[in-house]
Amino acid sequence: MSHNTFGHLFRVTTFGESHGVAIGCVVDGCPPQLALTVEEIQRDLDRRRPGQSRFTTQRQEADQVKILSGVMETASGQVTTGAPIALLIENTDQRSKDYSEIKDKFRPGHADFTYEAKYGLRDYRGGGRSSARETATRVAAGAIARKIVPGVTVRGALVQMGPHRIDREKWDWNEIARNPFFCPDKDKAAFFESYLDGIRKSGSSIGAVIEVVAEGVPAGLGAPIYAKLDGDLAAALMSINAVKGVEIGAGFGAAELSGEDNADEMRSSSSNMGNNGPVFLSNHAGGILGGISTGQPVVARFAVKPTSSILSPRKTVDRNGADTDIFTKGRHDPCVGIRAVPVGEAMVACVLADHFLRHRGQVGPR
């Protein structure tokens, strides 16, 4: 199985399966002498960790990360050496027996059939590499990526659950840490609690839309045509389990706008442009034009489908091609979009780190 690595200069390779001994990643291309502690990585992992509320899978994984290489102690603290940084997270709460009854059946909505079609076999124990368990390693890599681009802040929020959207006039980043949904709208978070409780108790699931905003991104990251910043962001976000759509800025909403409404007008800044660039009067472009960052906040949204593992019986076929029914046991998220928030942040941080290093390598410090 190839294609377990993403990035060009900042490269991340992930490994491990949902019910294997461990999962982990190797981060290559991290500059030397960056302050890095295991506590900083753990802080991001704890935001994604399962079992923290009744609205996520009850699989109890501590997700304690170990740094195996690429850092050393100095007089000023622990820093990166420039060597590959290997990170390991042990799996401690696998229950493979939950999947023994369906090992020969293809779960609708999962990658069971496609893995079997491609490789001739699949890991039925929690989905193996196709499990969202793999995304913990991306969050760990993202914690390192956050340190590379000076002055950049990457934050995510759940802005829609099922058909229910937040009120953007009530957006408050401080609210995200106060509810289990990463929701910036206090009133909508209260609604989501009762709404998802009903879905959870029925054994069903629901989808969500996540928005990631990167502020402080310098102008000039990305390149035309085949190395567009938004192209790489879209690919990175689409690589997350259960993601079925990505948009940048106004996204598909731009199709409803006129040219006058969509184009982000500009005015001269007090610094007479220079490296700070002009002042934009709107941000329908999501901080990217021609594949290159404008200096505005980079805004991306992605849609997460409902968890395919639900308690109601479903029609399917087995490995012999016979029609059958399937009943999925195990522990699953009623809305996998909740824990996708820190994963989306991590992927955006990794892409920005990669493009920052590529930009610096091509044009030098500016």
UniProtKB/Swiss-Prot annotation:
Alphabetical keyword list: Amino-acid biosynthesis, Aromatic amino acid biosynthesis, FAD, Flavoprotein, FMN, Lyase, NADP
Catalytic activity: 5-O-(1-carboxyvinyl)-3-phosphoshikimate = chorismate + phosphate
CDD domains registered for this protein in UniProt: Chorismate_synthase
SUPFAM superfamilies: Chorismate synthase, AroC
Residues that, per the record, bind NADP(+): 48, 54
Matches recorded under Pfam families: Chorismate_synt
Functional pathway: Metabolic intermediate biosynthesis; chorismate biosynthesis; chorismate from D-erythrose 4-phosphate and phosphoenolpyruvate: step 7/7
Domain of life the protein comes from: Bacteria
EC identifiers of the protein: 4.2.3.5
Note on cofactor: Reduced FMN (FMNH(2)).
Cofactors, names only: FMNH2
Gene Ontology process terms (BP): amino acid biosynthetic process; aromatic amino acid family biosynthetic process; chorismate biosynthetic process
GO cellular component: cytosol
Binding annotation for FMN: 129-131, 241-242, 290, 305-309, 331
Subunit structure: Homotetramer.
Protein task: This reaction introduces a second double bond into the aromatic ring system.
Protein name: Chorismate synthase
